[in-house]
C-alpha cells in the first residue's frame, strides 16, 4: 500500500497503466495531504471500474450531511460502500486527522469501520476538524488506486432535530477524467464531481498566467 523504491523493486514509468502519487507539505497556511492517481496511457476496464468506484466513495463521504454526535466509525460506510459493493475492501482506514504544521497523521478524529484498541473511534466530528477522505483499491501485483482530499467539518443548519454538520473540501486539484466511467456514477455523483471541478477551476485559474496551463486546467476540469 505504501511503496518505497529500491534498486530491486523500482518500476519504470511507462505510457500505460496507472500512477499513484501521495504527496503533501507544510505551509504557514496549514498541512496538506493529497493523493491523485493518473492514467498514463491505456488502462484496463477493471482499472477504470476500480478508479470510478474509488471516486464515488470519496464523493459520497465528502458530501455527507449528518447530525452532531456522529463519529467517524459511523460515517465510514459512506465511503466504503461502493467498494464493498464490488466485493473488495481496502485494509486501512478511510481517513485520519491532520494537524496544523505538525504531524500529518494526528487524532483523535478519523474515518474507519472497525474498532481498534489503539485508536479512539468514538471521537465525534466537530466543526473545524480536518480529516482526510482517501478510499482506495489495491490489487496486489496489478494496480493501486487512491483519491485523497482533505475535508474540514462545518456547521450547517440547526433546527428542532439538532445541529447538522457537513464537510467542505479544501483540497484543490483535478481528478483524472481519463480513467472515469461516467455511466458507473449516479447523476448525483456526477453533479458532485462537476461541482468540485468547477471549484478547482475557479480557484486555480486566477493563479495561472500561462495560457497553455490555463487551457490544460479547463480541459482537466471539464464537465462530464
Short names for language-model regions:
Residues 1-224:
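Active-site neighborhoods and metal-handling regions in enzymes and metal-associated proteins
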Amino acid at each position: 500500500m505504501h511503496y518505497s523504491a529500491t534498486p530491486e523493486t523500482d518500476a519504470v514509468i511507462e505510457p500505460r497503466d496507472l500512477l499513484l502519487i501521495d504527496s503533501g507539505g507544510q505551509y504557514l497556511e496549514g498541512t496538506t495531504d493529497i493523493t491523485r492517481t493518473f492514467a498514463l496511457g491505456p488502462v484496463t476496464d477493471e482499472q477504470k471500474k476500480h478508479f470510478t468506484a474509488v471516486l464515488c466513495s470519496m464523493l459520497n463521504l465528502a458530501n455527507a450531511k449528518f447530525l452532531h454526535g456522529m463519529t467517524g466509525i459511523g460515517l465510514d460506510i459512506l465511503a466504503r460502500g461502493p467498494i464493498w459493493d464490488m466485493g473488495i475492501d481496502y485494509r486501512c482506514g478511510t481517513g485520519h486527522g491532520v494537524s496544523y504544521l505538525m504531524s500529518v497523521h494526528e487524532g483523535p478524529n478519523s474515518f474507519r469501520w472497525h474498532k481498534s484498541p489503539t485508536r479512539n473511534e468514538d471521537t465525534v466530528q466537530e466543526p473545524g476538524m480536518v480529516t482526510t477522505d482517501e478510499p482506495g483499491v489495491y490489487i496486489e501485483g496489478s494496480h493501486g488506486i487512491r483519491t485523497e482530499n482533505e475535508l474540514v467539518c462545518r456547521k450547517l443548519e440547526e433546527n428542532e432535530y439538532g445541529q447538522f454538520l457537513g464537510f467542505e473540501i479544501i483540497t484543490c486539484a483535478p481528478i483524472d477524467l481519463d480513467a472515469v466511467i461516467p455511466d458507473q456514477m449516479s447523476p448525483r455523483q456526477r453533479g458532485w464531481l462537476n461541482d468540485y471541478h468547477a471549484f478547482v477551476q475557479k480557484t486555480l485559474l486566477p493563479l495561472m498566467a500561462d495560457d497553455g496551463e490555463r487551457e490544460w486546467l479547463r480541459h482537466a476540469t471539464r464537465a462530464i
